[in-house]
């Protein structure tokens, strides 16, 4: 399939249609007969397969050139007699064509034309020429970026190659590096070079003298014993704690000055002391260390950040020690203070993170002119409070750190927006972590945004996402799929490349997934809690009685309902928030409809409340009702157990292992999952795992080797895959062991917090240097974002009704 000029694509599609006019007329007529609307990629293919079944003469279409077009179509807009196709030949690349079904003619469409055509689904033929169009591409036109889809998510490697090539031009190209080393300070003290070194020749001479001097010292000589001599040559304390460490840094810089190399440059920048104070933003939900998991809007993100902070502090302490500095690092997790804390610590202003020495949770309330909001509110309703929250956070952070942070990390849409406001105000490096971009989780939530506005306020959220992702210095994701999806699925960030919200604005270029700001940095599970079921000496057998109570007790109450009559059967296990996207009710229905699967295994679900009246989350309440309905509709008594959300992480870890003892499996059935922390947890416990193919789990799991991919949009196939697995295990028990061990091997190779923290701090150093060297202050982009924030986001946020403690 051509991927060059748009006109070439138009001609290619036209030629493909011309070759089989009658067959394709039949297919397109079926699309048009469904009336105006949007057909997603799987619907296009499903309709094609139905057409082939009805008319066997269309079988040849399977091998036709047009089939490649159809397989790469992201969506189709049907407005009879037209069908417009968004064709995605590879991740990050889109082209648009429109077919007149009556004439079988083909037109090429620009992004703007395609989106205007799409808007007619909502607006009819209303004139959309004067709708605000957002286009960030001109601001980035001169910046380097890769072009291969395989390079997406490897931004720092590309930057290192680019920086090295610039430095190799001539000695003058090294001046920005010298300036960076001379101006780099902490608390007013120079970290690398002092005023004795004014230019590159002086630096090279000083490095040569230092190299000779250090070569005569024992490798383990403490820095304090030769500090005065090095300072006299122009070097300050940040080069290392021993003669060996300082010598390694000197050699790295000499190599860079002689012949810049990308890997050497990254190693050198990663060892420069840059990050001492970190601020992490996560405003929504109940952010605490105990009794919070399972509360509304409180789940994997809290676990992720707490594990991240512990690993990050360990790495910061290790690096500071190796750098020969006497600096105490500080990490602040900034979240919302909740006076109505529901028995948690969320009403405490400052709380030390357990397992750390210098990391704290700093809580700041949401407030308005009427005072402090005391109760929890949904993450979808926080937008009117964030600007004031950011101002208050700025003051509180300055007081706690007695200065400004070196790095600000945002989490989710609200945290990333606050991070953007703070980073712009303080002039600090900003890192974004999306966790989940709601636009991907709720299909067609952009074009039909008005239908969701009262409940979800997506207009504010999508606007905040665009501002934050364009303001960030670098973005880390857990998987490639989060950025650019896969061959058949669009990535979370990729979905923000071009979209429209009719009547509000049209995004013709929102984000470029080829931007070198994107980096894949995968987290792990806390291996003090999650470890293999076979590690008998570490097993928490004291918890087995309470676990068996959860699983098998005959008592029906607010913590568990349902019975498992045959306790000898293996258990299909799933644990998640109880919302539509996590699709726990979909798994229950999938299980309930397959008699063979019910015969082979029991089903245990952990999530949400049992009693609808205990929930305050709108979506969760609907799922609770659906779960109870499914139990009765399919008479699941005796084969199904529903357990309310569990907040004890240690017991949850042992629960995974207990399920493994039954030779059971873990299933993650979400319609979309950005990463899949529970997938990593279950695999770390060596529990065979089946997880959605939509999102990150498809990347974590090697299908058939370290687990299995499932498609929740085809529940019959999910059930068949599970049946096949259990039947194979019944005849060959080693099959269960093989998948169990394959999952564990995958975790050890790719998903640990140690590797994560090392990478994150290295990225912070490289992007700080890149921002300095390129003079990338992005004034034009910032002004554009400020205008967009002031003229669009602020009005959208302020249109959301403020919550009251009475209602």
Curated annotation (Swiss-Prot):
Induction: By anaerobic stress and by glucose. Positively regulated by the NF-Y/HAP transcription factor complex at least composed of NFYB9/LEC1 or NFYB6/L1L and NFYC2/HAP5B in association with DPBF2/BZIP67. Positively regulated by LEC2.
Cellular component, GO, one term: plant-type cell wall
Description of the deletion phenotype: No visible phenotype. Diminution of the starch content of developing seeds and increased lipid accumulation early during seed development.
Enzyme class: transferase
UniProt-listed Enzyme Commission number(s): 2.4.1.13
Catalytic reactions of this protein: an NDP-alpha-D-glucose + D-fructose = a ribonucleoside 5'-diphosphate + sucrose + H(+)
Key word Cell inner membrane present: no
CDD domains: GT4_sucrose_synthase
Taxonomy, superkingdom: Eukaryota
MF GO annotations: sucrose synthase activity
GO terms of biological process kind: response to hypoxia; seed maturation; starch metabolic process; sucrose metabolic process
InterPro entries found in the cross-reference section: Glyco_trans_1 (IPR001296), Sucrose_synth_GT-B1 (IPR000368), Sucrose_synthase_pln/cyn (IPR012820), SUS_EPBD (IPR056736), SUS_N (IPR056735)
Gene3D superfamilies given in the database record: 1.20.120.1230, 3.10.450.330, Glycogen Phosphorylase B
Renumbered residue ranges of the record's region GT-B glycosyltransferase: 274-752
Subcellular location(s) per record: Cytoplasm; Plastid membrane
Membrane-topology descriptor: Peripheral membrane protein
Function: Sucrose-cleaving enzyme that provides UDP-glucose and fructose for various metabolic pathways. Modulates metabolic homeostasis and directs carbon towards starch synthesis in developing seeds.
Name of the protein: Sucrose synthase 2
Species assigned in the record: Arabidopsis thaliana (Mouse-ear cress)
GN (gene name): SUS2
